[in-house]
Amino acid sequence: MALNIRKTHPLLKIVNQTLIDLPAPSNISIWWNFGSLLGLCLIIQIVTGLFLAMHYTADISLAFSSVIHICRDVNYGWLIRNIHANGASLFFVCVYIHIARGLYYGSYLYKETWNIGVILLFLLMATAFVGYVLPWGQMSFWGATVITNLLSAFPYIGDTLVQWIWGGFSVDNATLTRFFAFHFLLPFLITALMVIHVLFLHETGSNNPMGLNSDMDKISFHPYFSYKDALGFLTLLILLGALALFLPNLLGDAENFIPANPLVTPPHIKPEWYFLFAYAILRSIPNKLGGVLALLFSILILLLVPLLHTSKQRSSTFRPLTQVFFWILVTNMLVLTWIGGQPVEQPFILIGQIASITYFSLFLIAMPLAGWWENKILSLN
């Protein structure tokens, strides 16, 4: 009998083991779709970004005009630009759901996969930040100025560090040029890390909603989950199409339609919506260095989650108290996102401070205590 080429060919064999004959738990739900959706988002962003880069000019006197030129004069340039801008938003929606799934079902206990995922999140945030600067509108310029200036909070090296990143004494042409270089390069680094992320995942196999070993009940990835993923792809593409075609500026900031002007500060400087939760945590601490450290720790705290897992059960499926705390965390994130977009005045300052304390308390105190208490209740000690 002739051997199947997909199982013997050196390259096709890798594809086969990843996408076709991969043994997958039979009970994984819709929440396991988001990994493949992130892959789709990355492909969309790289392709649209490549076409935008062909027409974009990374120079402060031409950047804003080149974006207008793309939208007006390039064939379907307006569509490519709208897909790229809104694709970033959907990318972050998928990332946050993917992380939430990992937190809820205990997927973080695959430590290597989880830690690479956190590094991927940092790279994604860096890519989105430098990308937001490129159109060189008011919010691009002032967002870049404010966020990079936070590095000056670090003792001794802070000011030198900021000037090194700026390439001068203010956000200027050198800054825009290097940010364009970073924005072009980082997605390829993300792609490489994504391959390693998947590699580590396939060393252990996927987790499942029960949090139990599923070796006795696996099914092949194709056709079962390839079709299930295809449904997710279709849903995402319809959403992205609707957003890019009907409401392309819904998630953007009106200030960015004004060319960058170093002499006029916008009334409210704020980043894109997907950074607002971290921005709210940053603003809730009156001390500059304290705020920067809180901002960093709001993401780095994800690295501590596997170490703070106290429950004898992996998943939250049968842990009611942990479920309550998880949904408080989700609500808290939404509150922080809302606060990040509000002006710095009462009662927003107080709400932001309470939400920030709650955010860290849930990770560091509430969740570990809930796991310990549930062990006691179920006499699993």
Curated annotation (Swiss-Prot):
Q: How does it sit in the membrane?
A: Multi-pass membrane protein
User: Top-down, what is the taxonomic lineage of the species of origin?
Assistant: Eukaryota, Metazoa, Chordata, Craniata, Vertebrata
Which residues participate in a ubiquinone binding?
Answer: 202
Binding-site positions, heme b b562: 84, 183
GO CC term (a single one): respiratory chain complex III
Return the protein name.
Answer: Cytochrome b
Keyword vocabulary terms for this entry: Electron transport, Heme, Iron, Membrane, Metal-binding, Mitochondrion, Mitochondrion inner membrane, Respiratory chain, Transmembrane, Transmembrane helix, Transport, Ubiquinone
Q: Which GO terms describe its biological process?
A: mitochondrial electron transport, ubiquinol to cytochrome c
Species annotation = Isurus paucus (Longfin mako shark)
What CDD domains does the record point to?
A: cytochrome_b_C (cd00290), Cytochrome_b_N (cd00284)
Q: Which GO terms describe its molecular function?
A: metal ion binding; ubiquinol-cytochrome-c reductase activity
Classify the main location.
Answer: mitochondrion
Residues binding heme b b566: 98, 197
Q: Gene name, please?
A: mt-cyb
Functional description taken from the UniProt entry: Component of the ubiquinol-cytochrome c reductase complex (complex III or cytochrome b-c1 complex) that is part of the mitochondrial respiratory chain. The b-c1 complex mediates electron transfer from ubiquinol to cytochrome c. Contributes to the generation of a proton gradient across the mitochondrial membrane that is then used for ATP synthesis.
Q: How is the cofactor bound?
A: Binds 2 heme b groups non-covalently.
